[in-house]
Amino acid sequence: MRLLSKQSIERITKILLDELENVRENEQIRNIINSWKPLPSPEKSSIYAVDGSRSVSRLSGTVIYFLSALAVGSGKQLRLSYANAIKSNYGTSDQIVRMQMETLENMLGYLAYRKLEGEKRAILMDGTLTGSLVRPPVYPEDIRSLNVMRALIGESDFENLLNEFLEKLRDHYRKVEEHLEKNGNYDSPILTDNVVEKLRKKYIDTKVIAYGSGKVKVKIPRKALGYSPRVIPIEVLESSRGKSVDELLQELDEEKVELYLGKDDIYDALHMTLSYIEYLYSIDKLLEVKNLAYIAKSFYTKTLARTLGVEIVDTALLDAVIRTLIGHEKEGYLEIEHAVVPPKWSFPDFLLSKFRNIEKLIDKGIHLAYVRFEQGDVIYMLQSTTNIEKILPLILHHKAGGYLRPLQLAHHGVKISYKEARHTLEALINALRNRDPALKIFVKYGRSPLE
């Protein structure tokens, strides 16, 4: 099947040439090249690089997933792994998996840092810190679940739930650290899935009236659910028969939204709440790292491009400017003048106070730069909680060619191959069938005839 015609090539070429010409004709491009600095001299440092991987299989009644996080660097390799199953009709299953994978990476970054010695030590993470803070993996579903739980069990019990779970997390981290110190790996790093039943029995089963017999009515502020001011949600319409549109809009304006929640809704909200708290806790612990750096390979920011009024991503802009004015793709870096400040609205006030390191970072901001480690290579985004001029020499000590060797090793070492995932899944399915043949109804694979 032919996918590319001569006409398509001409059209694509014209689009890209027009963009390139817009950059070359812009009179402000010299301001950018004047900000492009040579790389500083490397400084000897100890370091760990962390990366994660996931494999997800959607079966007939279940989503089964495998997670892995690996730290490679100045000490022995450290690994966290996790296998779990969730309902396939769980509306945010993909986001839950991603959030738990990032939780593993953050946890491992924090614990690996504690094993490094010396003043000049750092942690390298793959991806961006701004992405984790500005748009968390399950946002806004996680925020909605938090507010549902808070309204359902009351502010006092919700506060007790948070404090109890955070105390469990502190104990859990000590346990994981002991296992890593002894064995270098651990296969039960996610706490939420092990305690959600116990906390449900304590805070919901014995306290929420009518929980066991049917749906529970709960009033929640409209803003907490993320509804637009003049929109009537379907669930509100369904629970408000006999009321006029004007009456419903008035109730919404007064922030009196009534929802009827079933047992599954409540359980999912609790699970989402605990997962999100565990995720935020992992970020908060990682932010204790003095020299923390994130390296992003793929990103689409337009911070510089907007200053020139051109519609291309910053990496393409930098490449075009450097090649036009210097004549080759010179190594170096460009630091963004102002730190990126995550918006506080991303986090409810009642939650942010529990995570002081996140709160401080929101006030302080995240330092950002574009870096090319070697002439002719690609440009990466560097984000750090530390000044760029301070963190860059530490990570340059571990440069190999156009990239950072520890991150490269972590990426290749953590990757879950298709073959490995299939063999592991088949072993799990066989174990389930041996335990009870009826369990096979949950693990049938609809695409198997196509493979």
From Swiss-Prot:
InterPro entries: NurA-like, NurA_domain, NurA_nuclease. Exonuclease activity is stimulated in the presence of HerA. SMART domains: NurA. Its EC number is 3.1.-.-. Mn(2+) binds at residues 51, 126. Changing residue 411 to A: Lack of nuclease activity. Weak activity in the presence of HerA. Its cofactor is Mn(2+). GO terms for biological process: DNA repair. One of its GO terms (molecular function) is exonuclease activity. Keywords: DNA damage, DNA repair, DNA-binding, Endonuclease, Exonuclease, Hydrolase, Manganese, Metal-binding, Nuclease. Changing residue 105 to A: Lack of endonuclease activity. Weak 5' exonuclease activity, but efficient 3' exo- and 5' endonuclease activities in the presence of HerA. Involved in DNA double-strand break (DSB) repair. Probably acts with HerA to stimulate resection of the 5' strand and produce the long 3' single-strand that is required for RadA loading. Exhibits 5' endonuclease activity and both 5' and 3' exonuclease activities. Belongs to the NurA family. Homodimer. Interacts with HerA. This is DNA double-strand break repair nuclease NurA. It comes from Pyrococcus furiosus (strain ATCC 43587 / DSM 3638 / JCM 8422 / Vc1). The gene is nurA.
